[in-house]
Amino acid sequence: MAATFQYPFQCIKSVERRNSGRQLIIGSAGPKIYTYAAETGERLGIWPETANTAEAKAAPSTTGEEPPEKRRKVSPPPDQKPEDSEPASQKSRKPEASPAWSTIPILAVSADGEYVVAVTAEDKCIRVFEVEENGALKQLSERQMPKRPSAIALADDDRTILCGDKFGDVYSLPLIDTGKGSVAPRAPAKVRPDQPAATTLTVHSKRNLASLEQQLRHYGQKDKNSAEEKPSSTFEHHLLLGHVSMLTDLICVSIPMDSSSEKKRSYILTADRDEHIRVSRGPSQAHIIENYCLGHTSFVNSLCIPQWAPEYLVSGGGDNYLLVWRWNEGRIVQKVPLVDETSDSEVAVRGIWVTDKMVLVAIDGSAKLLCFTLESDGTMKAQNSIQASGNVLDLTISSKDSAVLVSVDAVHVAGSTQEWRATPSSSSTLIEAFRLKSDTENVEWEPMSEAITSQVNSQGTSEISATLEEKQKKELNDALYSSGNLRKKNLGEDE
């Protein structure tokens, strides 16, 4: 049997359902989304649901390796035998229909824990799911955006999706699809004759006949293009703002309008590939630009505002440092180095997260999770880092015990975004848990043996063949580690 890896979790989220008090862990690995009980690690659901998933619901101990149940046939060939007449061993070897996407690079969760928003990459769809009582995901809508989404966030009302795309635009969409279109009516076209007034009876010279023939071909092609014109989007969405380059991250935040007022004003902070961070007002006034935070020299792809100190912003991207801002003033508070100043190695920040007055930073292709404390004056101090067993892909903070759950890449060699491990391990490590040591004065982390980690790691996700062709390996490399592609190439004078 060929050796196989397991798809690592590209995104992982901790979900606390306010209505029921139940805590879940949701992660996307390859083309699927998995949900788990946070306390026990029991797998509660897989989306999209397969025959194996349905069987697993009937028998919780099933790991998905047994023959699938009978499935509805879709357009079988005329000479294909009925499915019931085939041996079970042949049924189990039948490949399942592949979805139209290979990865789910973005997940977001509503504050009440009732809804999950996901982006499926290749089909450019934003999908909204309801988290059911049993922990499974029920898809409520799928909306194909004009351009591929590159960042999403939920607005302060928790019922509006903000979507940034690769062309720099930011749209707002209702969380629950209204079914109403929002495309502005087109201006009436100028009345023009459908065909030239001249005919072969009125044109006689060879040159004029050739010109007439060309005009007729032009009008015929125009009619064809009009007939083939794609229909407009039928779901409600509104353009809020735009950048002149690819939008890489966005967040929404509300702060008091002044020190003596309880009234708050919402803002949208957006980052792009051209080193810019833009501060705009909330969705209703997004056309108003408050200021820019300018100071990066490479792309910016990660923005983070601490909940306990919303006046500060931590940003990172292709520079070998982070910047701490007083974002409503556009003022840099501190420049925080990520590597030794003498190092010429390129750095790509993968993500920035906050927990317990601390800031955690992941670097693309690194198994080390950098840790900083955020002081009251907005400065950050480096602390002991977290060492994972593989490259850090994502993390989430458990609301139950503030444990840091880290998604680990068990496919690539630690420290590399291109080199695959020689052989898969007998049991893949998909997530690891860490917590702060309570009996030390300094900030120190220790690994935790949690039910959630052991259960998730033992159940695995989908399999990846260790003998994939180089082209397929490169596709997975690019899907997991895309930050480096944002870096602009320095072309020499002779190029």
Swiss-Prot record:
Stored Pfam families: WD40
Pathways per UniProt: tRNA modification; N(7)-methylguanine-tRNA biosynthesis
InterPro entries, alphabetized: Trm82 (IPR028884), WD40/YVTN_repeat-like_dom_sf (IPR015943), WD40_repeat_dom_sf (IPR036322), WD40_rpt (IPR001680)
Primary location class: nucleus
Subcellular location, record wording: Nucleus
Similarity comment: family membership: Belongs to the WD repeat TRM82 family.
PANTHER family (alphabetical): TRNA (GUANINE-N(7)-)-METHYLTRANSFERASE NON-CATALYTIC SUBUNIT WDR4, WD40 REPEAT PROTEIN 4
Quaternary structure and partners: Forms a heterodimer with the catalytic subunit trm8.
Protein's name in the database: tRNA (guanine-N(7)-)-methyltransferase non-catalytic subunit trm82
Species in which this protein is naturally found: Aspergillus clavatus (strain ATCC 1007 / CBS 513.65 / DSM 816 / NCTC 3887 / NRRL 1 / QM 1276 / 107)
Organism lineage string: Eukaryota, Fungi, Dikarya, Ascomycota, Pezizomycotina
